[in-house]
Amino acid sequence: NKKGKNKMAKTIENKKVAAYLGDAKLELSTPLIVGGKEIKEIVIKEPKVKDLKAVSHIHNDLDRTVTLIANKSGFTIDEIEDFPTHIYMKLQGLVEPFLR
């Protein structure tokens, strides 16, 4: 039954769209200087399962979170560690749901 298959595919497709959380963007009120460049926003790409597996061996919560933020934002771990705490806390809030 072709109609049944199309309906099923549409239902699955709708679920995929609903399940996609997307990339997260943090806009900075005061630009951050990183590597000599002025940063006005930080984008964290939505982690995939392989990204979560890549940090699952890290037992320290802070190190695991910093590593995931670095992996998904394009900044190095050292750069993330130099971020002001208030910016790190906002970034942590964006990735924390994936680390539960």
List PLM regions with ranges:
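Short, surface-exposed, charged amphipathic helix/loop patches that serve as local interaction elements
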Residues: 9-100
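Short, Lys/Arg-enriched N-terminal segments with co-localized hydrophobic residues
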Residues: 1-7
